[in-house]
Amino acid sequence: MKFIIFNGSLKADSESNTFSVCKMTQLAFEKLGHTCEVVTMRELDYESATSDVNDDLKPHIMKMFDADGVVFATPIWWGTHSCHIQALLERLDFIYSWAKDNKYQPFYNKVLGTLVSGGGDGFQHIHGVLYSAASNFGFTIPPQCNIESKAQGIEEIKTDEDTVNQVKNCAINMTTWARILKEGNPTKDARHGSVDINEEAAGVGIVTKQNATKDVPVGGEYMNVKKLGLSK
């Protein structure tokens, strides 16, 4: 399977603790037999926007459609994630809008993890913000896929037991849940938008001529809800 790590560090790779943990995570995926690419965003010439822009970042965004999982990696800066990861969220906004307009969520069969490097407060807030955004984008968030590394410097990072264990948890759980999603293909039966062809199966919405069935006639939305044991 394929995984992408977006490194949102503000420092050069040679000086970045975040990049060091990214490389550890990349190695963990590779040891499990999967491919993993680390994209250092500060090295790209990209535009801050909420629209589809042709620049250095776009090809990496497009790779997300073929990937099985994505990791957002960031240091803690003033209690929150870096400007590069914020820019990535903003650049994904056009996909979010497209998904709503076309009633199809392209990231439903994909998993997401987060990686936060830093010794100060803020990691829980960062995980929460990124998970909220990822959920709205359609990603599935497996358990214990939130890496928090307080270690400083590559040598300390490599030998820090907490960092090593969290990296292992993240890589193993992301690949496990990605495989489950790949085999189960929830995209097929999941609800993709505010109006969806599967709504009659979910017991919501108004039954029309287009989605009526022999068991649920036109106007029979209340009966459909009762049949599923749901309250009106």
Regions found by a protein language model. Give the residues of each.
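Ligand-binding pocket scaffold of soluble enzyme catalytic domains
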Residues: 3-10, 23, 38, 42, ...
